[in-house]
Amino acid sequence: MEEMSGDSVVSSAVPAAATRTTSFKGASPSSKYVKLNVGGALYYTTMQTLTKQDTMLKAMFSGRMEVLTDSEGWILIDRCGKHFGTILNYLRDGGVPLPESRREIEELLAEAKYYLVQGLLEECQAALQNKDTYEPFCKVPVITSSKEEQRLIATSNKPAVKLLYNRSNNKYSYTSNSDDNMLKNIELFDKLSLRFNGRVLFIKDVIGDEICCWSFYGQGRKIAEVCCTSIVYATEKKQTKVEFPEARIYEETLNILLYEAQDGRGPDNALLEATGGAAGRSHHLDEDEERERERIERVRRIHIKRPDDRAHLHQ
């Protein structure tokens, strides 16, 4: 499986074992292609790109440094190949969009230092400084409308968790533990947002129609919902009960991480298929399998206790 990127090709093939060290001697630098194995990722690129800027790569391919080559002619570079395509794009174009993640910018900075790509190094350092100066550790938007919520979820490349809490929606009095449980739900949401903010979009909703409800989104659609409220009878009077289903909330949060993008390639469909996620399922299904898929793809709505089931119960 190979992916094209400009004048480079990247593959995950494994090189042959036999190697030798030589000084690189190339002809026709404007047209000659070079085969590179960077930490197991294979790239084709041109001499023109490699020697365009004054970097370690230019030194390697102008004969000033020795290079290690395997028996199939692949030049071996003992570095992680994850960001090498970005390095090549920068050498070719003179600029690249930087990753959003601080961790990935730091990884790219380390590669820029190794290859002595001064311009990219300075851009990464400036981006990290801006993040330190202007960006808080954790951002949690509080939505103002359903359209804003839809836009946030549709445009995010992360899975999303939304907590809706709105005490003003209650028509009855609360049970004795409801206020404490409401606070526990809010506190857990805050803890999860601090722990997973780099991987999950967390959203607060204080204008919705529920009293306390968690929603979980993957690939732009709702995957599961945990409703924490129910109506109970106490001394012949209806009351609203808020519960704190901590284990269920943790379970659905971990499930939603299956929809996390993998190095910009989208979620791991094999993992989704193995764990029952709808996105990983085959499109070639018979009628029974199709019905089962539709059942699974419906939103998992978990109500701690259903009001209908409790309509005739008295406490």
UniProtKB/Swiss-Prot annotation:
One of its GO terms (molecular function) is Notch binding. Residues 32-100 form the BTB domain. A motif (PCNA-binding) lies at residues 239-245. PROSITE patterns: BTB. It is found in: Nucleus. Its main location: nucleus. Belongs to the BACURD family. Substrate-specific adapter of a BCR (BTB-CUL3-RBX1) E3 ubiquitin-protein ligase complex. The BCR(BACURD3) E3 ubiquitin ligase complex mediates the ubiquitination of target proteins, leading to their degradation by the proteasome. This is BTB/POZ domain-containing adapter for CUL3-mediated RhoA degradation protein 3. It comes from Mus musculus. The gene is Kctd10.
